[in-house]
């Protein structure tokens, strides 16, 4: 309050003119531009955060900080094959090679199981946590809209409810890019209430209604099939498949990780599918190459031991009278020129557990014949006459297998169109190291981008708080002013107390 022309203690007039305070209303002070900027930034951060979280789950699978995983198994396998080449015919050393190969297959299978666990965990989290929280958020915002309108009808601005709604809108913005629109609706003469609409525009420019005043949409995720599908039941009744049209946000980041395979499906992100495919390609190439290497050849270097149903040898010739031999590049099976009617008697080292022709990290196993000792690694894949007593010291096939582990090989996997896409050329050991390095680069890149986006988001949050939040400098100055006023008032009361004491106790004592 402010008094003008004198005070209550020293005035020559009875007329006092004072200026009081009239409160006409209380409202929030917010900058719509900063709110929109904040929600745009947090949506981008949500995408990167989901990517980084996915890579973090893959790191324990491929990041072999200690030499006791796949790379170590390849080294042990090479060593045991080298030893076998000097001990041709020694069953013990063949068993050692098989044991080291089994260790390698177990590691591949373990990695495959872990990848599947990551996929199932992320699918479950996406459906049970992300989608459930998002749907709950949409419902809560809609209910707050109704509560705020009811309060405004009674003349209450409902600022606390608006604070809750703004906080939920910020959280909603982390899931997908949203646009928030406010408008005033007249409910009586001079009486208005606030109407809130929330939409999101997809990458194709189509606008979808999430919240329309008291109505709200809901999301549904199908995680049982591949790829994972996301459907939106909009607030105004429409139904849309938004799996491929999310521009940013946690939903997009999680779907990217679950559905995308980088070069193998023509997308810009190496998700979980990419690492599943490259691991299976490594396993399939290993099995196919070693099965081919263990085939018996005749004196002309051609596959032999092609048998008919009755056990007789098939003699297949082309038009020039030359023998026809071939190896299927996909399965590693021997092909014959007898219209496919001949049986192949070969010595495969690997076979699939599910009977399929494609080897994967999940289905590869040691071939039954090698496992039960019916045959082993062929020391020589040449057709030779072997003396039953002295045997043979030929070992060129074992040496070829050692070289096979060390030579450069092209590794590829099929894309969505069935075309082979080469992703690496090098040795088996280096191929796995390349998978590890690729994951490390992706993980580091995601974390770096995440840190940058957090920094930008914090700057935007500070700018927004400078408008709608508490100004700490101003509050500090007010505290200093209060302290000074308090000190002055205390000094005035002390002086007044001393004066009264003097008047009461120090006067009227004359003549005592």
What are these regions (language model features)?
Residues 1-512:
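Structural signature of extracellular appendage/secretion-system components
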């Amino acid at each position: 309050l402010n008094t003008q022309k004198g005070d209550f203690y020293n005035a020559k007039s009875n007329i006092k003119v004072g200026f009081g305070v009239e409160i006409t209303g209380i409202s929030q002070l917010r900058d719509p531009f900063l709110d929109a900027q904040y929600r745009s930034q947090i949506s981008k951060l949500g995408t990167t955060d989901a990517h980084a979280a996915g890579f973090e789950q893959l790191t324990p699978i491929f990041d072999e900080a200690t030499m006791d995983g796949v790379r170590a198994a390849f080294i042990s396998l090479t060593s045991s094959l080298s030893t076998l080449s000097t001990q041709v015919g020694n069953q013990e050393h063949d068993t050692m090679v098989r044991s080291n190969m089994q260790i390698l297959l177990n590691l591949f299978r373990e990695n495959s199981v872990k990848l599947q666990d990551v996929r199932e965990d992320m699918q479950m989290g996406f459906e049970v946590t992300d989608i459930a929280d998002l749907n709950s958020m949409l419902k809560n915002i809609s209910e707050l809209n109704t509560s705020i309108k009811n309060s405004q009808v009674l003349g209450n601005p409902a600022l606390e409810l608006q604070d809750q709604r703004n906080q939920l809108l910020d959280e909603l913005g982390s899931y997908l890019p949203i646009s928030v629109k406010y408008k005033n609706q007249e409910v009586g003469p001079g009486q208005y209430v606030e109407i809130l609409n929330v939409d999101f525009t997809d990458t194709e420019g189509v606008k979808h209604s999430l919240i329309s005043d008291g109505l709200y949409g809901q999301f549904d995720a199908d995680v049982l099939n591949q790829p994972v599908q996301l459907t939106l039941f909009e607030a105004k009744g429409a139904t849309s498949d938004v799996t491929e049209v999310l521009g940013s946000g946690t939903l997009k980041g999680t779907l990217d990780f679950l559905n995308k395979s980088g070069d193998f499906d023509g997308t810009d992100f190496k998700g979980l599918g990419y690492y599943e495919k490259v691991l299976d390609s490594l396993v399939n190439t290993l099995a196919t190459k070693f099965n081919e290497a263990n085939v018996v050849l005749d004196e002309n270097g051609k596959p032999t031991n092609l048998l008919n149903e009755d056990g007789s040898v098939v003699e297949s010739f082309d038009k020039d009278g030359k023998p026809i031999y071939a190896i299927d590049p996909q399965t590693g099976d021997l092909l014959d020129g007898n219209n496919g009617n001949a049986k192949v008697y070969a010595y495969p080292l690997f076979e699939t557990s599910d009977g399929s022709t494609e080897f994967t990290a999940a289905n590869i196993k040691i071939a039954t014949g090698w496992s039960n000792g019916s045959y082993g690694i062929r020391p020589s894949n040449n057709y030779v006459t072997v003396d039953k007593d002295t045997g043979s010291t030929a070992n060129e096939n074992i040496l070829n297998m050692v070289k096979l582990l060390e030579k450069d090989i092209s590794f590829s996997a099929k894309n969505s169109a069935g075309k082979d896409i080469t992703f690496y050329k090098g040795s088996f050991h280096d191929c796995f190291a390349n998978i590890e390095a690729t994951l490390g680069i992706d993980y580091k890149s995601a974390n770096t981008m995440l840190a940058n986006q957090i920094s930008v988001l914090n700057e935007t949050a500070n700018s927004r708080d400078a408008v709608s939040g508490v100004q700490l400098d101003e509050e500090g100055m007010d505290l200093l002013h209060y302290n000074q006023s308090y000190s002055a008032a205390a000094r005035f009361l002390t002086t007044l107390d001393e004066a009264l004491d003097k008047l009461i106790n120090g006067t009227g004592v004359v003549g005592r």
